[in-house]
Design a protein with these regions (language model features):
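Flexible, glycine-rich loop/tail regions that form catalytic "lids" or insertion modules at the edges
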Residues: 48-316
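Catalytic or ion-translocation cores adjacent to nucleophile or general acid/base/metal-coordination motifs
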Residues: 1-46
Length: 316
């Protein structure tokens, strides 16, 4: 069986948007022994501030570039991009020791590690990819990991909104030939056999026609993780689709957010648009060839076979 340890001693996160409602435990973790970068400073009491923390920017503020400003006046000015000026950089960060977190697991520092039941990939996609789906098996899950891609955000250098491939959501950390990396995943699946973790893909960032996020995210992501846990426990069934297993109606707990995530919105979040997925197939073939093979990499045959099978299922 696969076991895991966390080699990190703490957490880091993007500050803007983090508040007591969106991520209570993350905010609680920053109350002591925390490093902040590129946030705003409230000069009156020497505390930090960022957009989304609350609706009261400090009047006596130092914005992230170091200028002393009246925060309320500063954030009311529309910048060159047509949006209000920001006191904190959009990608400003905090990093805090794990022991600060109120809900840190007692197993966090277990030297024996903890058993892994699920591996969850995730990209940032405005369309195409549903809220959550499960692979058919380990090899299919490895293909899903190889196909992870995201529209760029403020966290990446370059234009925002451009699709970038991010295999396993680990591109900056894959330190050797990516084909060998994928082959290692496939080999691990053979070793683990029926004890291999189930593999899932999530997308918290699907948007509606007006460009608004349809899923509330943050703490409500636990609702999707709850479905994943139940799938691992074998207590619920799932709907088989061309791309993998999707939740059945009623299996994601929406209690308390029914007004925000209506049945119609959930249908959109879980919709598999075959036309968009066929475009995804073409892009994956281009990516495998131009970005990997043509640059000296190699693609395991099992992944090409998975791509072919996906195309066949979409064409049925």
């Amino acid at each position: 069986r696969l076991y895991a340890i966390n080699p990190e001693n703490g957490f880091f996160g993007v500050a803007p948007g983090t508040n007591a409602k969106s991520n209570y435990n993350a905010l609680a973790s920053t109350m002591k022994n925390t490093i902040f970068t590129n946030v705003a400073l409230n000069n009156a009491d020497n505390t930090v501030w960022w957009e989304g923390l609350d609706k009261n920017p400090p009047e006596d503020a130092t914005e992230w570039k170091g200028a002393k400003v009246n925060g309320k006046e500063y954030t009311s000015v529309i910048g060159a991009d047509g949006k209000p000026q920001k006191l904190a950089h959009p990608n400003s960060r905090f990093t805090a020791p794990a022991v600060n977190c109120p809900c840190v697991s007692p197993e966090f520092n277990n030297p024996n590690g903890v058993p892994v039941s699920a591996i969850i990939f995730g990209g940032r996609r405005a369309s195409t990819t549903p809220l959550v789906y499960q692979s058919f098996d380990w090899t299919h899950g490895t293909y899903i990991g190889s196909a992870v891609s995201s529209e760029t955000t403020a966290a990446a250098v370059g234009a925002v909104g451009v699709l970038r491939h991010d295999p396993m959501a680990m591109k900056p950390f894959i330190g050797y030939n990516v084909g060998d990396y994928w082959a290692h995943w496939l080999e691990m699946g053979e070793k683990l056999g029926d004890k291999a973790p189930k593999i899932f893909n999530v997308n918290w960032f699907k948007q509606d026609e007006e460009g608004h996020f349809m899923w509330p995210g943050f703490g409500d992501n636990m609702r999707v993780l709850d479905w994943i846990i139940k799938r691992c426990e074998g207590t619920i069934d799932a709907e088989e689709t061309a791309i993998g297993y999707l939740p059945k109606k009623g299996d994601i707990n929406l209690e308390g957010i029914e007004d925000e995530v209506t049945p119609e919105i959930l249908d959109k979040l879980l919709y598999v648009d075959k036309d968009l997925w066929k475009k995804e197939i073409a892009e994956m073939r281009r990516y495998y060839k131009e970005d990997i093979s043509d640059k000296g990499g190699h693609i395991p045959a099992a992944l090409i076979a998975q791509l072919d099978k996906l195309e066949e299922r979409l064409n049925k």
